[in-house]
C-alpha cells in the first residue's frame, strides 16, 4: 500500500489545490478590477497615488491611506472622474492598533477588501550608519518600511482567508536585492530585503486563499528621491540602462497585473521595475 504524499506544508490553512480562476476570453477583460475593492497605503502622492488612480481607472473602488498629507480631495477626484467609490483614511501605519482600526473601518465602509497594496515607506538620508548616533533613525526606517507592512498583512490576511481569495502586494525595492551607490543606506536596504522575503514567505502561507507578490521599483521621480543632490542622481542614471528615473505612472502596469485575474497563477513573485538597474 503506497503512502499518500503531499507537497503542501500549509494545507491546514485552507483547501488545496486552489480552484483555478475563470479567465475571460478577451484577455484585456482579465485586467479589469470592476466590482473589487482596493486599499492602498501611502497613496496621497507618488507611487501610491498613481496606483490608486490606476485601480480606479480599471474599475475598482479605492480606499486611500495617508498620514501627513490629507487626501480627501483625491478620493473625491476618483469618484467624480471615474465613477467609483473612494474614501480617504488617516493612519499612522507604524501603530498596529491604528492599522487595525482603519482596516476594520474600510471593511465596514466598503463591505470587503479584495486588493491590498502595502506601499507606505520612507527613505534613509543619514549616510553611513556607523556615523549615526543611537538607533532612532534606524528604528524609524524599519518601523515604516518593514514593521508597518507586516501590520497591514497581519490584519488583512484574515479578511482574505474569510473570503477565500485576495491579492496582497508589497512595495519592496530594487534595494532589496542590491546595495545602492553612491549613497549609503544600510537600514533601507535591510528593511526592503525583509519586505521582499516577507512577501515570498506569505505567498506560501497564504496559498490556499490569496496571492502575495511584491513590486521592486528602481529610481522613481517622487519626493523620496529629493534628498539626493545632482551629482548623486547623475551616478544613478549612469548605472541605469534606460538612463533616467521613472515616472510613478510607469509602475502602475505591474501593480495592475498583480491585482487582477490576469495574474491568477502568479504568487511569490517580485517584479523589478527599475529601468534595468539590477541586471548589471
Curated annotation (Swiss-Prot):
Q: Which CDD domains match?
A: MDH-like_SDR_c
Q: Which residues form the active site?
A: 173, 188, 192
The UniProt keywords, alphabetically, are: NADP, Oxidoreductase
Q: Which domain of life is it from?
A: Eukaryota
Q: Which SUPFAM superfamilies match?
A: NAD(P)-binding Rossmann-fold domains (SSF51735)
Which GO molecular function annotations are given, in alphabetical order? oxidoreductase activity, acting on NAD(P)H, oxygen as acceptor; oxidoreductase activity, acting on the CH-OH group of donors, NAD or NADP as acceptor
Q: Which InterPro entries match?
A: NAD(P)-bd_dom_sf (IPR036291), Sc_DH/Rdtase_CS (IPR020904), SDR_fam (IPR002347)
Where, in this chain's numbering, is NADP(+) bound? Answer: 47, 74, 119, 188, 192, 220, 222
Q: What is its EC number?
A: 1.1.-.-
Q: What does this protein do?
A: Unknown. The enzyme has no activity toward sorbose.
Q: Which family does it belong to?
A: Belongs to the short-chain dehydrogenases/reductases (SDR) family.
Give the protein name, as stated in the record: Sorbose reductase homolog SOU2
Please report the organism this UniProt entry assigns to the protein. Answer: Candida albicans (strain SC5314 / ATCC MYA-2876) (Yeast)
Amino acid at each position: 500500500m503506497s503512502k499518500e504524499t503531499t507537497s503542501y506544508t500549509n494545507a491546514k490553512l485552507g483547501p488545496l489545490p486552489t480552484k483555478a480562476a475563470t479567465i475571460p476570453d478577451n484577455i484585456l477583460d482579465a485586467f479589469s478590477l470592476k466590482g473589487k475593492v482596493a486599499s492602498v497605503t501611502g497613496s496621497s502622492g507618488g507611487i501610491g497615488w498613481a496606483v490608486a488612480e490606476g485601480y480606479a481607472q480599471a474599475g475598482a473602488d479605492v480606499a486611500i491611506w495617508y498620514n501627513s498629507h490629507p487626501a480627501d480631495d483625491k478620493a473625491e477626484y476618483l469618484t467624480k472622474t471615474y465613477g467609483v467609490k473612494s474614501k480617504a483614511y488617516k493612519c499612522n501605519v507604524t501603530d498596529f492598533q491604528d492599522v487595525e482600526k482603519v482596516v476594520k473601518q474600510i471593511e465596514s465602509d466598503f463591505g470587503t477588501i479584495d486588493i491590498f497594496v502595502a506601499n507606505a515607506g520612507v527613505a534613509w538620508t543619514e549616510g553611513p550608519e556607523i556615523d549615526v548616533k543611537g538607533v532612532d533613525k534606524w528604528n524609524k526606517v524599519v518601523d515604516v518600511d518593514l514593521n508597518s507592512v507586516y501590520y497591514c498583512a497581519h490584519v488583512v490576511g484574515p479578511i482574505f482567508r474569510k473570503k477565500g481569495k485576495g491579492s496582497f502586494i508589497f512595495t519592496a525595492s530594487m534595494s532589496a536585492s542590491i546595495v545602492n551607490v553612491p549613497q549609503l543606506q544600510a537600514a533601507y536596504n535591510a528593511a526592503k530585503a525583509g519586505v521582499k522575503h516577507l512577501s515570498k514567505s506569505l505567498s506560501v502561507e497564504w496559498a490556499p486563499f490569496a496571492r502575495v507578490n511584491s513590486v521592486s521599483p528602481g529610481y522613481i521621480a517622487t519626493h523620496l528621491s529629493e534628498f539626493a543632490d545632482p551629482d548623486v542622481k547623475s551616478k544613478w542614471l549612469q548605472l541605469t540602462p534606460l538612463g533616467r528615473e521613472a515616472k510613478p505612472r510607469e509602475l502602475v502596469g505591474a501593480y495592475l497585473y498583480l491585482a487582477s485575474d490576469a495574474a491568477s497563477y502568479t504568487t511569490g513573485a517580485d517584479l523589478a521595475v527599475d529601468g534595468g538597474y539590477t541586471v548589471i
